[in-house]
Amino acid sequence: MYQIQIKRIYTEKSDTDGFRILTDRLWPRGIAKEKAAIDFWAKELSPSTYLRKWFDHKEELFTRFRELYREELEKNPEKDSFIRLVKEELEKEAVTLLFASKEEKLNQATVLSEWLKEQLSENTKEHSA
């Protein structure tokens, strides 16, 4: 199985990106759709508008943001189909979670990546039991 990686959408697309998923609710400023080369826009799995505005990429709020965003992910009706999609793509190629924020570590793609890895690990355990 391939790896999940995260990358800023403003960084040039590379051959190692594999399946590219945009994790922002809003389309990134100044990026043409062709240049973005998005395979899937996970708009419905991005943080809610309320949570995004509350967090506002403030470092001191990141721990709480992570908790609240993970709660949103767990309650999201789209989560199972998204996990399935990522799992299917990882069998063929890498999956790159894209974000627009200048903050490269404290963003929703980091949280989504952690959460996905946990979900995929649990799925693997369930199927091997």
Please state what every model-predicted region is.
Residues 1-129:
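Residues lining hydrophobic/aromatic ligand-binding pockets adjacent to catalytic sites
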